[in-house]
């Protein structure tokens, strides 16, 4: 029976357990086989075991059954203890080994990494980032810590800005909506989402857009509306002010000359910028904020502070000449002098200023001030009075005499009395005022076409002004721009100089770029119209082919230019006009008159009349100055056809203006010149008394001129009679 049982049990371990269960009861000791001799692979299974006999029983049997049972239990325990150690050391074939595959990082994991938290973050910030990344699903998260900006941005102080990219417009709106709802329900905040469309509003707009597209498809046309109010691609969520996270500033740290009021903001403001990928690449908002942060950190970095002054002396008044150099940074911290701890010094400064204004003398006079710093301040204020008076004196001179007063050039400081006085006052002025007035002097010389003052010298002085971190007011920028763009056409030169040189234009563009970095609004008529005039021709021209340029002659007061150059100028003007329209730049009367002259010089009459009509569309009254400019321009042009068209169209237009324009002597003189050019036989027409508009206009012009002459004669007679009356 045991043989049959063993045949039925084909597993070696099972057979051992069965035999051990029977033998333990009979008292026979079983010698366990060595584990190392057991094959680790399964043998070929067959219906019967091999005939080879295995010695399973030992030759020595024990009579005591209890001892046998104990030995069996000990052997089994020892075998069980040795199994884990031996099994761990046994060989495992390659097809049974578990391969530890290194998981490659998911390509989207890099986009979903959370940015590192800044120093002293608010407690809500980490939870906010995890929700934006995991629950909403915004990618490429970026965090900018703008709490160090001083002065703070318009969004508020202690600002932290988060940037995230949505997968599409619909995902953008859904994410912003869920984010706002989560903030309201979880943290009881009141977020403000600028650019977010509500759920129902978005559905309505999408439904209407689909309906319009369907109707347009049936009509055989396409939708040309540039902005449907849906595809903005940008939502700015202002989370609001949360607790904690404000940067602690040491008490007493304040900029010199700072004046303000209000309470210090407690807490941190968090703003989340959600954008589509296209919009984020287009506006590159992160780079703009990083640049602002870097510039602010450079401005607010620790500079050498002026040391404390000694208390004012009680006896004696002394005056020490100023020894300010370009390396003195103590006066570049602020435009206003630093606040003194001793208020008595302020009183002495005020007294010295009054005495200086009343009794102004040469630089060697004594000034009753208490400290050297007060003396320096008084001298800077005195230079503010004297330097403008010097420029006023220079502006009242004739151009030739003014050029003589400016000496030989930039390095000349002693050849004339004007230069000696100017640089004496400049040495006593503060460095900021000295740099500004030096730029003003160079601009005046360049506008007077002084050969010793070049534009590259002016731009070099401007760069020194910028490097010194002096303020750049708008008036100074426009003055510098006028000097760099100053140009006088010379048609008689070979080749004719009709446009501003490209080197001067490059300097002007660099100036505008620096002004934009300083916060100037360059999308203004003051900048754009100056550039528009700079790229244009300064005299009347007409385009010819390059091969015919040398043989072309001056016709009708117009100089021939290459058609390639002419078309290049037109392209630049078209781009500038597009910028003016896109930025909705408000143009005034002077700007429109400049544009009209440019189009007239280039012979672009269609653009000329379009600009003329645009004046009234912009709500600007076309008064006498416009019509006087119009008729004088056509009289100078010498084209009888254009003059005739202008007369027939614009004379009735004058009377339809609100209020209407009537003839005076000046306007009548300009219209008379234009009529004489367009109608050489005007005298015959007047004698025939033809019922024509031109004849009636001619009569009105003659009457206006005669009335002016009669009024002038009466005034002379009255003055002559008053001159003969006896004095009271």
UniProtKB/Swiss-Prot annotation:
Keywords tagged on the record: Membrane, Mitochondrion, Mitochondrion inner membrane, Transit peptide
Topology of the protein relative to the lipid bilayer: Peripheral membrane protein
GO biological process, one term: mitochondrial gene expression
InterPro entries: Atp25, NT_sf
Subcellular location as annotated: Mitochondrion inner membrane
Biased composition (Polar residues): 74-89
Keyword Chaperone: no
Signal peptide: none
Top-rank taxon, per record: Eukaryota
Region (Disordered): 65-89
GO cellular component, one term: mitochondrial inner membrane
Transit pept. (range): 1-29
Family indicated by similarity: Belongs to the ATP25 family.
Protein role: Probable mitochondrial mRNA stabilization factor.
Name recorded for this polypeptide: ATPase synthesis protein 25, mitochondrial
Organism: Paracoccidioides lutzii (strain ATCC MYA-826 / Pb01)
